[in-house]
Regions:
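Positively charged n-region of N-terminal signal peptides that target proteins for export
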Residues: 1-12
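N-terminal non-cleavable signal-anchor helices
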Residues: 12-15, 272
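C-terminal motif of bacterial Sec signal peptides marking the signal peptidase cleavage site
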Residues: 16-20
Length: 406
């Protein structure tokens, strides 16, 4: 097994005190274009169509991945409760199951998978602590969807010193020694969303961008890809404001400065409460919805909203419902990333106009394959593209689309 980490305890104590953060340049986005998952499946895996679109195709199978008996792979996500993250887990589990079947491993000989994620989605400190715990278990490889692209450098250095490769998936990291990045081409996908939204509002007017956080590369790439497309091809459309769900403190100060009216003060109080150290998820969700409502009141002429993931989309639709802006003449158009069951219902009900549906199952599967390839010294592509497609109410019931929903 790997050599013991004689410096582990001391260094991790320092990491906890300093926050374990580092800086560097962002990983480049992938190059995959919009794809529709094929309807055909191979015997034994109903999700084979999710694997057929992976580029390169080698990441859609486990042939030649002869891992040692009892090997353990750690996969660390940014969440675990949403449909997206459940699909990532499912894909990763299937890859490990395929490895065990292919090698004939049973019982204690099986290759093992441990999936972990912050209790509260996108909790940076919790994810860093999880990474510490997983590294202490001596996995053969780690796959991580980094909440904060600048965090975990100390932990990654420790992993490198002990021969544990790190694969990034979904959202990249600034760390320079990542062996592969498994993700959607967020920049291109967001540009597709921008083009569709601008077209739906008549290529003129104001729109808002609501992003899931200000730290992850997935959020940054989607934001940039969307804005760049608008600026390049839709000169009569204006991005009125970009707001991140974790920017509650800044918007609280703005609300307080903007008005002393009762409703605005209540909104500011809710936002401030969510910023408190022990605030629960309900406080945070209420504050985020209040902030979105404030932005819509600040920009009364907004005609469309881009939500960068399903969490944001749910918040946006809840607010629009409360303001009677999901139907009728005052309806505000919404496009979003992700395609879980709840979002498909919103799409069917006409409360969301279009979705960039990713391939989380393929992301999970390919991440395990990349981890195994790294362990075996087989080499990896710097970027593995997992595909996406544009889904609307008009095409959501097509067989080729249904195969990629989660």
């Amino acid at each position: 097994m790997k050599k013991r980490w004689s410096i582990l305890s001391a260094v991790l104590c320092v990491a906890l005190l300093t926050g374990g953060c580092g800086t560097g340049s962002k990983n480049d986005a992938g190059t995959g274009k919009e794809q529709t998952f094929r309807h055909e499946t191979r015997e034994g895996n109903e999700h084979q169509s999710n694997l057929d679109v992976l580029q390169p195709s080698a990441y859609g199978n486990v042939q030649g991945l002869n891992l040692e008996k009892g090997s353990s792979i750690s996969i660390i996500g940014r969440g675990s409760s949403s449909a997206y993250w459940k699909a990532v887990q499912e894909g990763a589990k299937q890859a490990v199951a395929d490895i065990n079947t292919n090698l004939g491993y049973k019982g204690n000989d099986k290759v093992k998978l441990v999936y972990s994620a912050p209790e509260t989605e996108n909790d940076v400190d919790d994810q860093v602590n999880i990474l510490d715990e997983e590294l202490a278990r001596y996995p053969v490889a780690v796959g991580i969807a980094a909440v904060d692209s600048g965090a975990c450098e100390v932990q990654f250095d420790l992993a490198a010193e002990n021969g544990i490769p790190i694969v990034a998936f979904d959202s990249g990291t600034d760390y320079q020694n990542i062996v592969s990045m498994i993700d959607t081409d967020n920049t291109t996908a967001a540009a597709t969303a921008a083009s569709k939204l601008c077209n739906s509002i008549g290529e003129s007017g104001q729109i808002l961008v609501i992003a899931h956080d200000s730290k992850s590369t997935s959020s940054e790439e989607r934001e940039q890809g969307f804005v760049q497309e608008v600026e390049k091809n839709d000169p009569n459309v204006t991005v009125a404001e970009i707001w991140h769900l974790d920017d509650l403190d800044a918007i609280s100060k703005e609300i307080n400065a903007d008005s002393s009216e009762k409703n605005s003060q209540e909104t500011a109080d809710n936002v401030q409460k969510a910023e408190e150290e022990n605030a629960d998820s309900r406080d945070t969700q209420t504050a985020q919805q209040d902030a979105i409502k404030y932005l819509l009141e600040k920009y009364p002429d907004v005609k469309g909203i881009f939500a960068t993931n399903e969490t944001v989309a749910d918040l946006v639709v809840n607010v629009l419902d409360s303001m009677d802006k999901t139907t009728g003449e005052d309806r505000i158009k919404v496009v979003s990333f992700d395609g879980g069951e709840d979002q498909m219902k919103l799409l069917e009900d006409g409360k969301i106009d279009g979705l960039i549906v990713q391939n989380p199952y393929g992301i999970g599967y390919a991440t395990v394959v990349a981890c195994a390839r790294a362990v075996l010294g087989q080499g990896n592509e710097a970027t593995v593209s997992t595909g996406y497609t544009w889904v609307t109410k008009d095409n959501m019931n097509k067989d080729s689309i249904k195969k990629m929903l989660y």
